[in-house]
């Protein structure tokens, strides 16, 4: 399924080398101020350019095509689109014959009987996380007052010293290898009683969404009382 959530419902579409990536968000109250400029900071953090990130360069300018009028949300589903411009589809000409390790090429081919779009990973590409970033921007707009986030890269390739991260990445690139890492996110001011028992607990729902990010292979959740 490409749809997630209940009160704040996300629907994602598009492929890595298609014309657009898009997301529709349902459940946003009417009267929330929103503009394309609100997305700039978070989209810039996601944008490639740092060592170890994808060489793909996309402007990622959000086009808000529904659910917004006179700078305010209307209460209708909010639809946001991002154009795909930096595509090199010729690089994937042999993907259907030579599947890439640790990618979804083989599984997608068999799941969809060979009708899937293999270019850049198609619908399974991390390119679609630009839509999740956009959803996060909107979600922060409607959070209760007092909820704050603090996020950092805690570890790369076993190194916990930020000053050593670049060297770890350089060494991995020289060996044509890859390394894992840990991202730490602390949320303060979470309302009491968030979530539902068992299948829709806060931990269950958070982990569910986090694992939709292709690079996420493990999630650890804990409570810290301050």
What are these regions (language model features)?
Residues 8-28, 127-136, 199, 211, ...:
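Conserved phosphate/anionic-ligand binding catalytic regions in large, soluble enzymes, centered on
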């Amino acid at each position: 399924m490409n749809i997630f959530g209940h009160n704040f419902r996300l629907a994602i579409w598009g492929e890595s080398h298609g014309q657009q990536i898009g997301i529709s968000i349902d459940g946003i109250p009417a009267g929330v101020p929103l503009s394309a400029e609100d997305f700039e900071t978070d989209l810039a953090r996601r944008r490639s350019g740092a060592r170890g990130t994808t060489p793909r360069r996309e402007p990622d300018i959000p086009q808000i095509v529904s659910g917004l009028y006179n700078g305010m949300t209307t209460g209708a589903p909010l639809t946001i689109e991002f154009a795909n411009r930096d595509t090199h589809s010729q690089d994937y000409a042999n993907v259907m014959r030579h599947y890439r390790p640790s990618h979804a090429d083989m599984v997608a081919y068999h799941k969809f009987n060979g009708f899937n779009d293999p270019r850049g990973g198609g619908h399974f590409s991390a390119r679609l996380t630009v839509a999740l970033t956009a959803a996060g921007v909107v979600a922060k707009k409607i959070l209760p007052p007092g909820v704050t986030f603090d996020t950092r890269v805690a570890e790369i390739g076993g190194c916990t010293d930020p000053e050593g991260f670049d060297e770890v990445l350089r060494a991995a690139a020289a060996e044509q290898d890859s390394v894992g890492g840990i991202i730490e996110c602390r949320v303060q001011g979470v309302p009491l009683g968030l979530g539902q028992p068992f299948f829709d607990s806060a931990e269950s729902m958070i982990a569910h969404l986090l694992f939709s990010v292709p690079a996420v292979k493990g999630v650890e959740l804990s409570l810290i009382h301050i």
